[in-house]
């Protein structure tokens, strides 16, 4: 089982400790410490109960002890057993186990109850089983980075949810970017949705660190696809593609396949379709995926056409941005009415704006054709007005249906907007005459129950701007996250 890393080394989680009592006779040596083949010895201990002041102390005294035991478990596989030189025998008490676990209750008292004095557990590691027994006898939790996974498995196997919860809490406490993929794999294996969700959140926030960790190439294909499907990864798509190629090379080795272009494509399967190649720049695509040998010649040509020609041909790959943002998408519209016939001659529609709080803009809503279904070419930009610095842009296109609705045009990555800084929203369209907005608002307030007000102020930009102003024109909507 993989370790949680250096930050967790040597740590253990401890629950309730046994209260000190009067000095009494020492407990008999446990058979697990005597070796696997020695005969059991029950040394009489007179009046040991008098030295234990509480029920908890009395049961804790019986933990891993032959005293009054009526069953033994033989554990013969795993690292713990190997280190001990062979099978280990661990004594226990049927009543205590049945009181703490429905699985043990069925084992000892159910319709097919066993009467055997020794029960073999070949799939359980001794250290994990002792951690389970310690918890059942004393409520004490004793887990560490090297045993937490096997203890979680054992707690689930014997239906002890309280110990499961302690294991998950321990894992959550030690969750970091460099072990997030390893823990995500285990969380999915053990059906721990809360831990899996926390792992995914960590991967979202620190994607580059997470995919650079050794554990990334060890994940299974289903976990890889679950991550690639996410809209919230904070990484450039070209770097994500490089990490996926590394995973494919490791998977070829696991399956004992030659590391060839064809085999990498084979092991990736559906995961390849989840890479969002349209989010790359043409330079990133040319330097990486186009030369990787993983894509077919037809796919490479189609993607190059997508990057270079207008109108852009449809491609098989997702072009939705990975927002790396939390919360709900928001949208404001600055116009109160829609009219017909707004023409385009190559001049950009522009409108300046400020906002009262930090937000991230992910796209615009634009008006489409008055002549029925049509495709438009469009370049969208956000420019910091004072510095004349372009913060983000996208050469893309959109299809409209001839209605007066707005149509979403998205940036490849979210653009951070700072409070009280002036920006210019810019859209350069190529296509037929469109609808346009009128009765524009200088101030638009967006309010949600979960967040404070987001207030936009709009100003006309100097110059022609294709006629767009505060009062009327294009760029009716701004799509953003708070």
UniProtKB/Swiss-Prot annotation:
GO molecular function, one term: cullin family protein binding
GO cellular component: cytoplasmic ribonucleoprotein granule; cytosol; nucleoplasm; P-body; protein-containing complex
Keyword Cytoplasm: yes
The entry's keywords: Cytoplasm, Differentiation, Methylation, Myogenesis, Ubl conjugation pathway
Pro residues bias spans: 22-31
Protein name, UniProt field: BTB/POZ domain-containing protein 1
Pfam family, one: BACK
């Amino acid at each position: 089982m993989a370790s949680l890393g250096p930050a967790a080394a040597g740590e253990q989680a401890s629950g309730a400790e046994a209260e000190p009592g009067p000095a009494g006779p020492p407990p008999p040596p446990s058979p697990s410490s005597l070796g696997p083949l020695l005969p059991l010895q029950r040394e009489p201990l007179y009046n040991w109960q008098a030295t234990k002041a509480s029920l908890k102390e009395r049961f804790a005294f019986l933990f891993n002890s032959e005293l009054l035991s009526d069953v033994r478990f033989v554990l013969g596989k795993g690292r713990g057993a190997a280190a001990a030189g062979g099978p280990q025998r661990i004594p226990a008490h049927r009543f205590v186990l049945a009181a703490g676990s429905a699985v043990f209750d069925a084992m000892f008292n159910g319709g097919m109850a066993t009467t055997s004095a020794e029960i073999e557990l070949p799939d359980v590691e001794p250290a994990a089983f002792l951690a389970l027994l310690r918890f059942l006898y004393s409520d004490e939790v004793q887990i560490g980075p090297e045993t937490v996974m096997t203890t979680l498995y054992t707690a689930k196997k014997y239906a002890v949810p309280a110990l499961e919860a302690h294991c998950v809490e321990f894992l959550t406490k030690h969750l970091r970017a460099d072990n997030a993929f390893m823990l995500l794999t285990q969380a999915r294996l053990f059906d721990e949705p809360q831990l899996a969700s926390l792992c995914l959140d960590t991967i979202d926030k620190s994607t580059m660190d997470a995919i650079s960790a050794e554990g990334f190439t060890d994940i299974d294909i289903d976990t890889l696809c679950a991550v690639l499907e996410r809209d919230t990864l904070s990484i450039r798509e070209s770097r994500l593609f490089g990490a996926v190629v590394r995973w494919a090379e490791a998977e070829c080795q696991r399956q004992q396949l030659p590391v060839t272009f064809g085999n990498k494509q084979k092991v990736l399967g559906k995961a390849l379709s989840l890479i969002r190649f349209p989010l790359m720049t043409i330079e990133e695509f040319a330097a990486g995926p186009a030369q990787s040998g993983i894509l077919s010649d037809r796919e490479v040509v189609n993607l190059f056409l997508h990057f270079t020609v207008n109108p852009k041909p449809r491609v098989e790959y997702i072009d939705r941005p990975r927002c790396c943002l939390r919360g709900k998408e928001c949208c404001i519209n600055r116009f109160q009415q829609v009219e017909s016939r707004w023409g385009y001659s190559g001049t950009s529609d522009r409108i300046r704006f400020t906002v009262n709080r930090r937000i991230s803009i992910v796209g615009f809503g634009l008006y489409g054709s008055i002549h029925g279904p049509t495709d438009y070419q469009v370049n969208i930009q956000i420019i910091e007005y004072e510095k004349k610095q372009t913060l983000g842009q996208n050469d893309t296109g959109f299809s409209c249906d001839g209605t007066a609705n707005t149509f979403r045009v998205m940036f490849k990555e979210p653009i951070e907007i700072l409070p009280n800084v002036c920006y210019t929203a810019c859209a350069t369209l190529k296509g037929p005459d469109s609808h346009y907005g009128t009765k524009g608002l200088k101030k638009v307030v967006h309010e949600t129950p979960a967040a404070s007000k987001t207030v936009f102020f709009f100003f006309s930009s100097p110059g022609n701007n294709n006629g767009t102003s505060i009062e009327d024109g294009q760029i009716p909507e701004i799509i953003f996250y708070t």
